[in-house]
Amino acid sequence: MNSTLKVCINAIGYVVVFALLQVIMQYPVSAIYAYCMDVPFSLVINWVTIRPIELINEVIIPSTICAHILSIALFLLLKWTPISTRYISKKPYQVLGLIVLFSLFLVLPLAGIYELMGIEMDKNIEMLFNTMMQKPFGIIAVAILAPIVEEIVFRGALLRILLEYFSGSKAWIAITISAVTFGLFHGNLAQAVNASFLGLILGWLYYRTKSIIPSMVLHLVNNISAVVLTLSFSSDSDIKVVELFGNNLPLAVGCLTVSALLAFGVFMLIRKKI
């Protein structure tokens, strides 16, 4: 088998396996719920497909958590994502601290850009995610497990294998492919654009450090920030960025500009240190 075909099969296989696990795990969880509630299994599956928000506590969140944990175990045990302590043994705490700052400074500028682009999430999907993030186990699934498993799959496995083929000056091809795949995996335009852009940064961090720890830290901070913002403004999910500054447009633009400049400055520091 030539190297190109091997890379393609492995890359596609990683994504397909991860996607299938997200779907497949809904069936045993739905079966358990159907048995406990003494309702037809087919009816539960229909609810999950048509009205998932009605079973968010009973099926959606448990199946998501199970799928994430199973994916982590599978990718690590099969060594699709190799485990190494090489990076953490260097005690890169300063870099990781800078990555946390970078992620925090990036939140508002990106929100402003997406708002200007007119990118809005489908209302049903938005309602589902907002509801999940108001549940304790939903927060664990979205803010903690999702960043961990997605870094293991999309950087530790997918990008790793792509970099074996697209090496050197072609590394950006691998980073772009993994970022776009990561974006498309989210299944809606709003998240696809956001995740693809984030995926470029996450991929670059992995490429420079050969470790998923830096990208995982950034991803965790990003998702936790999203949860905090959602919970802070849960009563008004359609709030605009300018409203965070009392509808004072000059103040909003100024703060977003300063935040963007700080993010760029921190990024340049990270670039020098890795």
Predicted regions and their residues:
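Alpha-helical transmembrane segments
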Residues: 7-22, 97-106, 177
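Hydrophobic residues within alpha-helical transmembrane segments
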Residues: 13, 17, 145, 177-181, ...
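Alpha-helical transmembrane segments in multi-pass membrane proteins
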Residues: 18-79, 98, 254-255
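Juxtamembrane helix-loop-helix connectors linking adjacent transmembrane helices
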Residues: 33-55, 80-149, 159-164, 238-244
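Structural signal for the C-terminal ends of transmembrane alpha-helices
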Residues: 73-83, 205-209, 264-273
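Residues that define the loop-to-transmembrane-helix transition and helix capping
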Residues: 137, 172-173, 190, 212-213
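Membrane-interface helix/loop boundary segments of multi-pass membrane proteins
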Residues: 149-177, 204-211
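C-terminal membrane module of polytopic membrane proteins
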Residues: 220-274
